[in-house]
Structures are given as C-alpha cells and as structure tokens.
Swiss-Prot record:
Name assigned to this protein: Small ribosomal subunit protein bS18
GO biological process, one term: translation
Quaternary structure, from the entry: Part of the 30S ribosomal subunit. Forms a tight heterodimer with protein bS6.
SUPFAM superfamilies: Ribosomal protein S18
Domain of life: Bacteria
Transmembrane segments: none
Pfam families documented for this protein: Ribosomal_S18 (PF01084)
Keyword entries, A-Z: Ribonucleoprotein, Ribosomal protein, RNA-binding, rRNA-binding
Function: Binds as a heterodimer with protein bS6 to the central domain of the 16S rRNA, where it helps stabilize the platform of the 30S subunit.
Amino acid sequence: MAFFGKRKEKRKFTQQNPLFKRRKFCRFTAAGVEEIDYKDLDTLRDFVQENGKIIPARLTGTRAIYQRQLDSAIKRARFLALLPYTDNHN
C-alpha cells in the first residue's frame, strides 16, 4: 500500500502571485534611442551592479541589439576611466 500523507490545502494569496512576473520592456526601444553613447554615464550606471558587473538582458529586459551596444559602451567608458571596473574598496 502506498502512503500519500495528508493533502495540502491550496494557499490563497492575498498579495500578488509570486510566480507572475511583470513583462519587461526595453528602455531604449521605448525612448527611440538609435545608439547608446559611452559618455551618457547616468544611463550606463543603471546597467552596472555595485560590484562592477554588467546586468544581463534577461534581468533588465533590454533587447539584444541594445544589450550589445550597452556592453560596448560600458567597456569603452571603463577604458577611458569614466566608469570604475570594480566597486570602491574601503
């Protein structure tokens, strides 16, 4: 004989369903940007983590063409010392 145990009751979520995720959208497509500039540091900082890593497109919702431009712009800004490679070590 198989033992199935007690049946678990279904939970009713009063808040949002944790499995439902909001659809991400590309900021650059919405703004009509044609090319990402390496001198626009405020925009570039939004796509870099505190430890210096570039945030992947699957988390930001950026389209592939803009993610490649963003990657190049961040690397170019790092090379020119406009952005740090890593976080500040205290």
